């Protein structure tokens, strides 16, 4: 009986993957460990008045869910470590 209980405890820990936190970029070269409950990395891009000369503005980060899409804003969401790199730094 003790062996069965120990096996169940070990299986529960393995299945729950306790302590895992997602890692996301917050700038082109810096990443952070996301807070508990933040299971998505995102990359937002949009044009401002200088888009033609400077390119799109970018925002990186962690979120609980993929941010809402608004007109003129592109959003990419993903759920693996460092999956939201700067578009020019992608492999």
UniProtKB/Swiss-Prot annotation:
Family: Belongs to the three-finger toxin family. Long-chain subfamily. Type II alpha-neurotoxin sub-subfamily.
GO cellular component, one term: extracellular region
Tissue expression pattern: Expressed by the venom gland.
Protein name: Long neurotoxin OH-37
Record's function text: Binds with high affinity to muscular (alpha-1/CHRNA1) and neuronal (alpha-7/CHRNA7) nicotinic acetylcholine receptor (nAChR) and inhibits acetylcholine from binding to the receptor, thereby impairing neuromuscular and neuronal transmission.
Main localization (coarse): secreted
Disulfide cross-links: 24-41, 34-62, 47-51, 66-77, 78-83
GO molecular function, one term: acetylcholine receptor inhibitor activity
Keywords for this protein: Acetylcholine receptor inhibiting toxin, Disulfide bond, Ion channel impairing toxin, Neurotoxin, Postsynaptic neurotoxin, Secreted, Signal, Toxin
Subcellular localization, as worded in the UniProt entry: Secreted
Alphabetical list of PROSITE patterns matching this protein: SNAKE_TOXIN
Signal peptide range in chain numbering: 1-21
Species, as recorded: Ophiophagus hannah (King cobra)
Highest rank taxon of the organism: Eukaryota
InterPro entries xrefs: Snake_3FTx (IPR003571), Snake_toxin-like_sf (IPR045860), Snake_toxin_con_site (IPR018354), Toxin_cobra-type (IPR054131)
């Amino acid at each position: 009986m003790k062996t069965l209980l120990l096996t169940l405890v070990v299986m529960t820990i393995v299945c729950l993957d306790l302590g895992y936190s997602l890692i996301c970029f917050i700038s082109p070269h810096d990443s952070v460990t996301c807070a508990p409950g933040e299971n998505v990395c995102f990359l937002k891009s949009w044009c401002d008045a200088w888009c033609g000369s400077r390119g799109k503005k970018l925002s990186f980060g962690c979120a609980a869910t993929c941010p809402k899409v608004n007109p003129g804003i592109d959003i990419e969401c993903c759920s693996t470590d460092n999956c939201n790199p700067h578009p020019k730094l992608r492999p």
